[in-house]
Amino acid sequence: MTKLSGSDTKSTLYCSFCGKSQHEVRKLIAGPTVFICDECVELCNDIIREETKAGIAGKKDGGVPTPRDIFETLNDYVIGQDRAKRVLSVAVHNHYKRLKHSGKGGDVELSKSNILLVGPTGSGKTLLAQTLAKTFDVPFTMADATTLTEAGYVGEDVENIILKLLQASDYNVEKAQHGIVYIDEIDKISRKAENPSITRDVSGEGVQQALLKLMEGTTASVPPQGGRKHPQQEFLQVDTTNILFICGGAFAGLEKIIADRLQKRSIGFGAHVADPDKRKVGELLQKAEPEDLLKFGLIPEFVGRLPVIATLNDLDIEALVKILKEPKNALVKQYAKLFELEDVTLTFTDDALEAIAKKAIERKTGARGLRSIVEGLLLDTMFDVPTESDIAEIVVDKDVVEGRKEPVRVLKGKEEAA
C-alpha cells in the first residue's frame, strides 16, 4: 500500500470517503483506484472499537460478559497485573450475573462480593476500576476516603459518594443502583491505634462504621443538592444493595505485618526463612490475609464486607516501558497526537523509554509518575512548536531524558540539534 503526499504527484488527490484533498490531511493511503485519509482510518477504527464494546454485552449468559471478555478488555488498557485482572474479572462477572438472576427467585440468595485492591502507588488500581466501568457502561464514581468523616463533622459525609454516583447517572436512580463506586486511599481510614480509644476517631474507625451499611446494602437518603447547605430539599432514596464497591489503597507498612506473620510461622529447625527485606512489596502483599488487615487498623466488620482481595505487584522497567507505548491510550500515543495536531512527528527512541521508566522507579511513583516526567521533557518544545512552522520532527533519546541535551528538532528539509 503506497502513501502519497503533495510532493508525490502533480495532480491533487482526494480521499474517496470524506472528499478532503491531500493538502487538508496528513496522509493519503492509496488502494486500487481509491484513496483513504488518516482521519477516515481513525474514524473506522473508532466505529469498530465501539461495535466490539457493544458486542461484548451480547456474549454468553444473556448479556453478562464472560470473565475472559472482561480480562481481554482490561488488557487493552492495563499492562501486567494479570493475577489482579483475573480476580477482578471473575468477581465482576459474578456480580452482574447475580444482578441478572436476582429477580428470578429461587432458594439460594446470592450475596454481593465487594472488592479490595491492595498495591503500591501507581500500580494501576484506579485505572482497573475505571476500565471496568467503561466495559459495562454503568455509572461510575470515585471517592477519596481521606476527605470522608462521620455525619455531623467537618468533611464529606459518606452519603456524598452516592450523590456523586447519582450525578454520574444523570439522577437516574435505577441506573445508579447498578453502578460501580471506587473508594481510593481506603488505607488512610484505618484505626489510629490498634486498641479502641475512648476519644472519638471521626476520620478513621468512624468512617469505616459509616461505610459499612452502604457497602452491605441499605436505602440511603441522598440530598440532590448536597446535605448541609439546603436542609429543606427532598431526599432521593437509593438502594445500595446492588452497587459494587471497589476499595483501593497502597497500605504502606502492610508488607511488614505480613512478613512478621510469615516469619513467626517459619520458626523451627530446618525452616526456610526468606529475608523480608529481599522480597518485593508486591510479593508480600500477595500473601495478605484478613488478620493482617485487622492488625493494620481496619475493623473486622469492614474487612468482612470486602471478601475479594486482589493484590497488585510493583511495576518493573519492562512493564513501565510497555505502559508508555502499548495501551490504546498510552502516554507516547497521547503526546504523539498532540504534536500531530501541529503537523510534527514525535519520536521516542527505545533507550529513551527505558530511561523514563528508570526515572519513575527511582522516584517511587510507579506509572502515575510517567506523565510528569514526559511533560517535563517536552515542556519547552511544546512551548516553541506552535510558533515555529519549520519543525518536522522531534526526537527524544536517552541523553534528553538524562538531561544532557534538549530534544532534537528535525527541520523541514534539514536537521538541527537544539
From Swiss-Prot:
One of its GO terms (biological process) is proteolysis involved in protein catabolic process. Gene3D superfamilies: 1.10.8.60, ClpX chaperone, C4-type zinc finger domain, P-loop containing nucleotide triphosphate hydrolases. SUPFAM superfamilies: Glucocorticoid receptor-like (DNA-binding domain), P-loop containing nucleoside triphosphate hydrolases. Zn(2+) binds at C15, C18, C37, C40. Residues 3-56 form the ClpX-type ZB domain. SMART domains: AAA (SM00382), ClpB_D2-small (SM01086), zf-C4_ClpX (SM00994). Coiled coil: none annotated. Belongs to the ClpX chaperone family. PANTHER family: ATP-DEPENDENT CLP PROTEASE ATP-BINDING SUBUNIT CLPX-LIKE, MITOCHONDRIAL, ATP-DEPENDENT CLP PROTEASE ATP-BINDING SUBUNIT CLPX-LIKE, MITOCHONDRIAL-RELATED. Component of the ClpX-ClpP complex. Forms a hexameric ring that, in the presence of ATP, binds to fourteen ClpP subunits assembled into a disk-like structure with a central cavity, resembling the structure of eukaryotic proteasomes. This is ATP-dependent Clp protease ATP-binding subunit ClpX. It comes from Novosphingobium aromaticivorans (strain ATCC 700278 / DSM 12444 / CCUG 56034 / CIP 105152 / NBRC 16084 / F199). The lineage of its organism: Bacteria, Pseudomonadati, Pseudomonadota, Alphaproteobacteria, Sphingomonadales. The gene is clpX.
